[in-house]
Amino acid sequence: MNYLPPFENNFWTYLLIGACVFALIQLVYVFNFYLRLAYRRKSNDPQVSSFPPVSVIIAARNESDNLYENLPTILSQDYPEYEVIVVNNQSIDDSNWILTAFAQQFTQLKVVEISKSPHLKPGKKLPITLGIKAAKYEHLLLTDADCLPNSNQWIKQMMQQIKASQQLVIGYSPFIQTKGFLNKLIRFDNTWLSASAFAYALANFPFKANGRNLAYTRTLFQKVNGFKSHYAISPGDDDLLLQDAIKYSAVATGLSP
């Protein structure tokens, strides 16, 4: 009969206990963060009888096709008072012609032109800053030219989330479903990342925002000095701004794209 030393004899017991502890930690993690989404109350407050005026800001560069397809839906929102500011960032396509035509049809559309220059930094930070300067309202809602709201209630659903203590709202922005495995993979990754962002935000640990659907106030933008702390970095008009903003405001979530 072979003799097993005490440690080797108990190895599998220790391993099983370790696996159970690890599984328990994972369950606590899931319950503490991700289940917050399942029990999040949808904000459809019947007492909201009036909505603040809103400036929708879109930074666009060579987006003529997307502007032609998506801008009419944004300009036809069911919202009492809002303007749409498109910052045409050095475009060399037909964007100027399309925006001019839409501006004649929709009085709430304002166009800001940025002339082409080799000295301008890439990215959306300058266009967004110029759009905010041109905006006449306190509440700002940002999206991209290649994004299409799923209904004419988009602005209302985002503005329902803003409160005095929550001056920034991170919104959901799913990818459109098309054929192919790659699209499935992209949509899964985006959904998982969005769920993580919302779950952590609901737990008061926000770490990610998406510039395709993001709202905040002009006051908050000015408090963090805009993009000054990270202007040298091309990306970050959403995530890095969020990290500055949470020093001054709590974060709300808007799950309706």
Per-segment meaning from a language model:
Residues 137-148:
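Short beta-strand-to-loop acidic/aromatic patch adjacent to the donor-nucleotide binding site
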